Amino acid sequence: MLRNLLWATSKHDVYLTQNYSVMHWSSMLRKSREVLNVARPVVPTLNSPGSMAQTVSRVQISTMTVKDNLMVAGGFQGEVMCKYLNQPGVAFCTKVATDENAITNSVDVYNNPSGAMRVITANNDAQVRVLDGGNFKCLNRFTFPWSVNNISASPDGKLLAVLGDSPECLLADAQSGKVVSNLKGHLDYSFASAWHPDGNILATGNQDTTCRLWDVRNLSESVQVLKGRMGAIRAIRFTSDGRFMAMAEPADFVHVFDTKSDYAAGQEIDLFGEIAGISFSPDADALFVGVSDRTYGSLLEFNRRSYDSYLNCIF
């Protein structure tokens, strides 16, 4: 599991997976409700000419993201589902890959330089697919030398960070798929990436238990190496203001760093259980951690401490 099964759209609204469902949790009402059930057949409501849309069922969700009211989820059999949170039904669903090991490892939603919304998927078949965010037609398909575990678009929509079963991480042009830079430094396979909101810093998480920070203005080597406690770095998130960065290990540990201190100041959150995902609220005041452990399954909320002067604790 690649640990991206949780997304906060506000300080009070969190979307997370539970069995064959995506649930919405309201921290204000202290209630949860089901917004998507994939145990039953899911029929797309949009089916424009040339669309790849098809019915899917019993989807085991492998990854998820939410942006601008659009939720995109991927499945273990190559499924992709797109649902507008303010509309009934699922707008689009299909199997983008049909290989035996075609898991959808990563999905992202971004706006290209002209402002058009794009949905991007990364699969174990070594392909990255770019879909139109309006009609969900496939616009581009990029092939890489290895299974792609994670993909993320830069804030300006011009670059894609492509990570997978290789120690090297790639930066590719989002329009053409052409590799523009090869990032070397990690020792094992990579699983996570995130862009600082200013677009200059890319963070990559690896099975070598480190997160490396790269400055896109000088990619000759990483500018920082942040170490985890004992496991691979499986998820990375920045706050919307860029002040904090969080990274999660497969289980038990989430690390929060203060970017203003050049990542020197931080806090380690020690918990019990497998980590399903991490997400900051858009206002940067809350950090949510999903725990998928059978015994300790839960959703944890950490609130940012506010003081007149900076003290030791961040969250």
What are these regions (language model features)?
Residues 1-166, 170-172, 182-184, 227, ...:
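WD40 beta-propeller repeat fold
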Residues 165, 179, 206-207:
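Active-site cradle of extracellular carbohydrate-active enzymes
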Residues 184, 194, 200-315:
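Structured C-terminal portions of repeat-based eukaryotic scaffold domains
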